Amino acid sequence: MRTRNNLYKKLYSKKSHRFLTTKVRHSRQNDIDNRKIVWHAIASFYLDTELLEYDYERIAALFTQSGFSITELKKIDLYEVFPVLKDNLLTISGVWNGIDEGWLNKACTLTYYRRNNNFFRMKVRFYNRVLYTMRKEHWIKIESIMRSKTTPQIPINSNLIENS
């Protein structure tokens, strides 16, 4: 077994016959841990309840703290959360009181590993063409809140207004 620049020790898995470096395994786990909060925030788009302004503010704050760009957040929604929760958009009596965290973490982790598969991506984009309208309003509100938070607010000096 040859290592690149002898930096990382390769690990061999007999079951899968794949080589993974220690660094890759840890970076994937860190990436998944960072995404869990985002998965739970995005999951509220799929509940059968109406989100209030407070909910959008909370979700936008979580998205801002996550460090992901809006484009990355939309990709996380499309390829990691949407495949898991799209059925809740289709059912007449969908889940409305919340989604089990453990189940959501496991299911989204599986789709995280499948997200680069071309067939998987094609299938998800097909369903998304039909169902995106059900999530579009959420993303529009979140984007506007995130833009307003990042745009610097210029304070108005009342003395300047009075003197003119």
Regions found by a protein language model. Name each.
Residues R28-L62:
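Short terminal alpha-helical segments
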Residues T3, D55, I99-D100:
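Poly-acidic low-complexity segments
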Residues R2-R4, R18:
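Basic polycationic patches enriched in arginine
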